[in-house]
Structure formats: C-alpha cells, structure tokens
Amino acid sequence: MPRMSLVLLWLCLCNSAWALSSARLDTPDVRLSLGPHMSYLEDPRGNLSLQDVQNTPSERFQAVNHDHVNLGKNTSVWWFRVELDNRLAETLPGFLEINYPLLDHLQLYLQTPDGRVSQQESGDRFAFTQRPVQVRNFWFPLQLPSGNSHLLIRVDTTSTVFLPVFFSTYGASAQAQENLMAWNGAFYGMLFAMVFYNLFLFLSLREATYFWYVAYGLNVGLLGACFDGMLFKLLPDYTALQGVSIYILLFTQTLAAAQFSRHFLHTKDFFPRLDAGLRLAMLVILALLLSGLLLDLQLWGALASLTLLSTSLALLLVGVFMWRQGVRYGSYYTLAWSVLLTAFAIVTAGSLGFELLGLYGATTIKLGVTIELITLSIGLANRINILKDEGFNSRRAAEQANLANQAKGRFLAT
C-alpha cells in the first residue's frame, strides 16, 4: 500500500510538472497553442495586483491541460500564467493571439529574462483603434529575447471566459489567417447568396415567407460577424454597442426564427392555437430583450443564450408536430432545425463552461447555420411546388365540377 501511494504521488508530480512545463520555441517560424502550458488563478473579488500574483505560490495555480481555456460565465477575474522558452540565440518576434473577440478587458504583462516588465491591454471595452494590433481578435506584439520569459494575462469579462491562446511568428500567423479567411469567405458568400436569392423571390412573388427568410438570414450574418469580431471592426468607435450587440442579436434571432416559422409552416391557417402560442412566445422574447435595461449584463447574456436554445428546441418540436400532421415540407423544416439545435446546444453549453464533443466557437455555429439555411431554401422550393400542385389540383377539380354542372344542365334542358 505505501508503494502504491508513492507511485500515485509520483504520477501527480509528473503530471503537474508536465502541465506547467514551459512553451518551447526553437524554430524561427512557429505557431504554438499555449493552453497545455498555461495555469490559472481565480481572483473572485478582482483586487489582486500584479505583485500579488507574482508572489502567489505555484501550488495555488491550476493547470489548464487543454488546448484552450474555457471557464464559462462567472463574475471572477482570472489570471493566466505561462512561461515562454526561446531556445534560439536571437530575439524571436511574433504575436500573442487571443482569438475570442468578446472578452471585455485584457491586461498582458511580459517579464523578460533581464527582469524588465512590459504591459499591454485590449478588449471590447476599447475602441478598435486603441488595440495594439488592429485585427478582429485580440493580438499583442511580442519580442521574446533568448531564454525564459514569463507571461501573465489578466482577464475581466462578462462574457464566457474562453481563451484560445497562441504564440505565432509573423509568417505562421499569416498562413493560419489565410486558411481561416478562405473558410469565412465561403460562409459569408453562401449566406449572402441565399439572402439575395430569396430577396429576389420575395420581390417577384410578394410572399411574406421569403421576406422573413431574408430577415432571418441577415440576422444570422450580423450574429456571425459579431461572434467573429468583424462587427467591431466595421463599427470601430461604438464601444458601448460592442458589449451588448451579441445579446441583442441573439434575441432578435429568436424573434426572426419564430416569425419565419409561422409563415413557412402556415400555422395561422392550419393550427390557429399553435400560431397563437408562437405569437405569445414572441411577446415573451421581446419582453426579455427589453429586460436588458434593468438586468445585470452577465445575467442578461446568460438569459439570451438560454432563450435561443429553448426557442430552437420549441421550434423543432413545432416542426415535428406539423410534419406528423401531414404538412409535407415540415420534413425540411425539422431537419434544418435539428442541425441548428445541435449546433446551438454545443455552443450554449460551451458558453456556460461545459464543452460537448470538445467543440465551441464560431465554426460550430457557422457549420450549423450553413446546413440549416440551405435546407430551408430547398424546403421553400419544395413548398412552392406543393402549393402549385395543390392549386393545379384545385383548378382541375373546379373545371371538372363545372363540366359536370354543364352536362347536368344540358340533360335537364332536354
């Protein structure tokens, strides 16, 4: 038994040593995730100074042991620590990338081997022009001398404490961004192609369903731009709007989705009570949106995420119900919302600190939205064909009835 205890203690010490090992930088072109090399300290009251954190024993820091940090939504301030080991003989220039654009306030402290400490700060509370590097995420330029440099990051935010942190040299960073830009270009290109196609159909057919598809698609685009940090870049000086825009868009997303669903599924014509329930739900969502004037921002943000998730689940159940009642294009609607609900569930759980399948971030939402919008557009086309067939069958039945009446009239006349 004593031997087993010693083995377990040795394994724990080895794991701790591995978790807090320095980030080794031994090539002039590198992009390295710092999550596995980071540890963190919670500051519940937010009153610890830099000196307090530097003097804190290592045992009080917890190892991240993941590719990135996700501590969910909370009211604490967090300190993250990592040691950067430049094995090269010369200074290594690059960026510290924190690729999550919804963080409120970041303070970065770098202590070089000669003991000097430099400070930088950023966050969505600052105007875009005040960022150390004017990109959509939070990047900090670093010059790492040969040897060990110690990095501390202070995070104070009302959003999810999510930090995908990388050290990247200039060339490696440009290469990674080029690949990401290709994916983003494909997503936004598809999105606006679907929006303009359905806008053309709305202008041609004057059908309200297409209008609400366009409204829903535009809201998706704005939400994606906000989640990506592009909205901050387009509106660089509106710092007050930056802090609340994503929550406003989450609520308007649910409103647009509910209104589109009412028109797509013809709930008013087929199931008036269900339609009344959807309208009541929209009034509740509107009230929750306006409650942001009274509630704490962090509570309101969590409420927005839960509202989106619960509304998506409710709309999925509406689609299943309509499909089972014989509305044929309800199958497309159900498939679309099944995919999107899965994406929303993953992201909402991630925003609360529980990562499902190890996924969180804009990519999950974009993939779900892409499949959903394409499926709904196909469903709209199928819906048109069904309505045309129903109209043709109605006209044919009317013509046959008219012919029968004429024949009956001639028979009676004779």
Regions found by a protein language model. Name each.
Residues S5-S16:
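Bacterial N-terminal signal peptides
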Residues L20-M181:
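Soluble non-transmembrane domains of integral membrane proteins
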Residues L102-Y109, F211-Y213, L218, L222-A225:
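Carboxylate/His-rich catalytic cores and anion/metal-binding grooves
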Residues V165, A174-S204, A302-W323:
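First transmembrane helix
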Residues M194-N219, T267:
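Juxtamembrane interface at the cytosolic side of transmembrane helices
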Residues L222-H263, T267-A397:
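Interfacial "cap-and-anchor" motif at the non-cytosolic start of specific transmembrane alpha-helices
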Residues N393-T414:
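Primarily the dimerization/phosphotransfer
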